[in-house]
């Protein structure tokens, strides 16, 4: 069954003039663009609608337009696309943003708009429509471009009256989003809301928890451009970016909001929804203009970025020292774990996936063959060290693998200086090697019944 999603917010027209630019005007020192193509598309909250339609959702839109030709165009366009359309009219210009683009580069943007709040009577009409139709929808998306539709009165009333989750793409006054299910500011917006600049991981944590608590939010997602996203629920979780090429970030925030709403309405949890949204954004920033991504494009994109097994991710001590220094310099959170990983199994994979979720980069130390033999006996390892390292390096969760000769990874940990040191749940109450170096030690429970020793014993009994 298709999810049914209601969008409220500022609709506008995105107007594109595509052309060629290879000369300077004789009238003034400015570029001349020879227009070759012109497009009008749904923008603002309308672009959120476009993205939802591309995913396959059933969509409704509540907004305000002017009593002008652009308002008529928007209404007709929504209706042509099969959108349940509730557009109220006021004596104000319909927002239109014109972008002139040459050689895939935006030269200039011209805005025609009115930013003042909509009239009190119009606000009441919006709420009347909302009360009448909300029972038909699974989720509400508020797309705020600060053009006057989502006033504090409208926003707060919608949040309080909604019987379904309300997700918000915020702008400026965050207080009006109090009590929302989720808001998704970018780093700049979040910094402005908390009153301090987010410069590193600690700033990000402080800002995220502050916003979540003070605004009484169920969840919060801070989008971090090329650094991915940070999810704040019961714990903070990082989702790395997946964009390969960035041509135009126009509308990427709309895509993320739409993708989050669509995935949650389809029954996904927030982490799964964020991964889906990240992939969708990776598709659209590779296009020009306020683009959309279909489910087929997202699936194809996901396949294209899957990590291929390669020895390039297997490093020696010297290489990992340089890499670690660079990662620390860039403020990345390094997670480190280690083990023999003799026969890679489900328990290992799930353990490593959970470890990766704790930071930005996962480095895995692997015992050498000689080290395994000393620890496990003369009949081990089953698989030689390079094979074990290669298999680990092929996992999506693992960023780097280092083989160490010692019985413990202490010397390697001294080089890496991880932010988080991860060991299995069986280390509860035991001293963890390297705990004096890492900033934090985390224990992750293994999958019950999954162990290399058990597999080896079953093999021997055959």
Swiss-Prot record:
Annotated region described as Ribokinase, given as residue ranges: 1-309
Source superkingdom: Bacteria
Cellular component per GO, a single term: cytosol
Pathways involved: Nucleotide-sugar biosynthesis; ADP-L-glycero-beta-D-manno-heptose biosynthesis; ADP-L-glycero-beta-D-manno-heptose from D-glycero-beta-D-manno-heptose 7-phosphate: step 1/4; Nucleotide-sugar biosynthesis; ADP-L-glycero-beta-D-manno-heptose biosynthesis; ADP-L-glycero-beta-D-manno-heptose from D-glycero-beta-D-manno-heptose 7-phosphate: step 3/4
GO biological process: ADP-L-glycero-beta-D-manno-heptose biosynthetic process
Gene Ontology MF term list: ATP binding; heptose 7-phosphate kinase activity; heptose-1-phosphate adenylyltransferase activity; phosphotransferase activity, alcohol group as acceptor
EC number: 2.7.1.167, 2.7.7.70
Residues annotated as catalytic: 254
InterPro entries registered for this protein in UniProt: Bifunc_HldE (IPR023030), Cyt_trans-like (IPR004821), PfkB_dom (IPR011611), RfaE_dom_I (IPR011913), RfaE_dom_II (IPR011914), Ribokinase-like (IPR029056), Rossmann-like_a/b/a_fold (IPR014729)
PANTHER family linked to this entry: BIFUNCTIONAL PROTEIN HLDE (PTHR46969:SF1)
Subunit structure as annotated in this protein's UniProt entry: Homodimer.
Primary role: Catalyzes the ADP transfer from ATP to D-glycero-beta-D-manno-heptose 1-phosphate, yielding ADP-D-glycero-beta-D-manno-heptose.
Protein name: Bifunctional protein HldE
Species this chain originates from: Nitratiruptor sp. (strain SB155-2)
Name of the gene this protein is made from: hldE
């Amino acid at each position: 069954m298709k999810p049914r999603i209601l969008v409220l917010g500022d609709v506008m027209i995105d107007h594109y003039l595509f052309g060629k630019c290879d000369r300077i005007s004789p009238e003034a020192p400015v570029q001349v663009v020879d227009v070759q193509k012109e497009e009008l598309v749904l923008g603002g909250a309308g672009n959120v609608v476009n993205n939802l339609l591309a995913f396959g959702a059933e969509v409704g839109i509540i907004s305000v337009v002017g009593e002008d030709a652009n308002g008529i165009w928007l209404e007709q366009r929504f209706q042509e696309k099969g959108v349940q359309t509730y557009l109220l009219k006021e004596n104000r210009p319909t927002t239109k943003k014109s972008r002139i683009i040459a050689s895939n580069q935006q030269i200039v943007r011209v805005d025609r708009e009115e930013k003042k709040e909509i009239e009190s009577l119009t606000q009441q009409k919006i709420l009347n429509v909302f009360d009448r139709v909300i029972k038909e929808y699974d989720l509400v998306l508020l797309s705020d471009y600060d053009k006057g539709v989502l006033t504090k009165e409208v926003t707060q009333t919608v949040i309080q009256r909604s019987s379904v989750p309300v997700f918000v793409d915020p702008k400026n006054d965050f207080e009006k989003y109090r009590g929302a299910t989720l808001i998704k500011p970018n780093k700049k917006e979040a910094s402005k809301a908390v009153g301090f600049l987010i410069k590193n991981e600690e700033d990000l944590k402080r800002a995220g928890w502050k916003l979540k608590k003070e605004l009484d939010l169920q969840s919060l997602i801070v989008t971090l451009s090329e650094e991915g996203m940070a999810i704040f629920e019961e714990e903070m979780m990082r989702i790395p970016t997946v964009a390969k090429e960035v041509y135009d970030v126009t509308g990427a925030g709309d895509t993320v909001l739409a993708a989050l709403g669509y995935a949650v309405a389809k029954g996904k949890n927030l982490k799964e929804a964020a991964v889906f949204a990240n992939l969708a954004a990776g598709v659209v920033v590779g296009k020009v203009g306020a683009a959309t991504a279909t489910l087929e494009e997202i699936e194809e994109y996901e396949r294209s970025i899957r990590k291929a097994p390669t020895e390039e991710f297997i490093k020696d001590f010297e290489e990992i020292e340089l890499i670690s220094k660079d990662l620390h310099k860039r403020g990345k959170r390094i997670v480190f774990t280690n083990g023999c990983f003799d026969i890679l199994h489900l328990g290992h994979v799930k353990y490593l996936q959970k470890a990766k979720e704790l930071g930005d980069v996962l480095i895995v130390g692997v015992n050498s063959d000689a080290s395994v033999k000393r620890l496990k006996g003369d009949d081990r390892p089953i698989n030689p060290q390079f094979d074990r390292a290669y298999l680990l390096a092929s996992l999506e969760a693992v960023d780097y693998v280092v083989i160490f000769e010692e019985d413990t990874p202490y010397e390697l940990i001294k080089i890496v200086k991880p932010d988080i040191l991860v060991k299995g749940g069986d280390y509860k109450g035991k001293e963890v090697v390297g705990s004096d170096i890492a900033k934090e030690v985390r224990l992750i429970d293994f999958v019950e019944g999954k162990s290399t020793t058990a597999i080896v014993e079953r093999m021997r009994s055959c």
